[in-house]
Amino acid sequence: MSDVTTAEFNEEGKYLRKVRSFVLREGRLTKGQAQAMEQQWPKIGLDYTPEPIDLVEVFGREADTVLEIGFGMGASLVAMAKAAPELNFIGIEVHKPGVGACLAEAAEAGVTNLRVYHHDAIEVLENSIAEGSLACVQLFFPDPWHKTRHHKRRIVQAPFAELIRSKLKVGGVFHLATDWENYSEHMLEVMTAAPGYKNQSATGDVVERPAHRPLTKFEARGHRLGHGVWDLMFERV
């Protein structure tokens, strides 16, 4: 599940820190996760800075960059990085055990094209990522906040869509996925109304899961139980 920060804005479109779109459940690190934090963070961890990072300097090369918001335990993100060594990947996660698990997984997989933030995703996007610098932004299985009174906590709102658009290159893609049909309808409504995007679905709604997005264990179990998953892909134009 993706867990990210606030979804409330002031009149100028600036994010406010009032409504969180995640529940902070820190949890204790396992021995392996703690070891990965100690050994791997200096190699692929990114410390938050309030100014844009230089992607060429960070990765030591020029390449298209994919950013994932809320990577959970990181298994699918590491799998994607390993499967596409020609791309740069950045993952953002607020929960430390997930970061530790991702670092351990990355070390085991031997990936060198992945960097990780343990920080608030909105702050990273607003301040650390240059405009027009990303080839793709991924938001997979964000908290659906399924109760109506909690819908304001959903991360996918109009100002958030604009923030993502500003960070994408022209032709870059915002890829969303959810296993809550109501949230997929909300996502579609927000993204269809958002200026500067084109839906990549030929039917104007959802797309089939692309081959590059790994099928998670949770998702595979859902399929066996007859649960749906909805992917949406919107291109910056």
From Swiss-Prot:
Its EC number is 2.1.1.33. InterPro entries: SAM-dependent_MTases_sf (IPR029063), tRNA_(Gua-N-7)_MeTrfase_Trmb (IPR003358), tRNA_methyltr_TrmB_bact (IPR055361). The active site is at residue 143. The keyword Transferase applies. SUPFAM superfamilies: S-adenosyl-L-methionine-dependent methyltransferases (SSF53335). One of its GO terms (molecular function) is tRNA (guanine(46)-N7)-methyltransferase activity. GO terms for cellular component: tRNA methyltransferase complex. It is an enzyme of class 2 (transferase). It catalyses: guanosine(46) in tRNA + S-adenosyl-L-methionine = N(7)-methylguanosine(46) in tRNA + S-adenosyl-L-homocysteine. Substrate binds at residues 147, 179, 216-219. CDD domains: AdoMet_MTases. S-adenosyl-L-methionine binds at residues 68, 93, 120, 143. Gene3D superfamilies: Vaccinia Virus protein VP39. Pfam families: Methyltransf_4. Keywords: Methyltransferase, S-adenosyl-L-methionine, Transferase, tRNA processing. Pathway: tRNA modification; N(7)-methylguanine-tRNA biosynthesis. NCBIfam families: tRNA (guanosine(46)-N7)-methyltransferase TrmB (TIGR00091). Catalyzes the formation of N(7)-methylguanine at position 46 (m7G46) in tRNA. PANTHER family: 3-DEOXY-D-MANNO-OCTULOSONIC-ACID TRANSFERASE/TRNA GUANINE-N 7 - -METHYLTRANSFERASE, PENTACOTRIPEPTIDE-REPEAT REGION OF PRORP DOMAIN-CONTAINING PROTEIN. Belongs to the class I-like SAM-binding methyltransferase superfamily. TrmB family. This is tRNA (guanine-N(7)-)-methyltransferase.
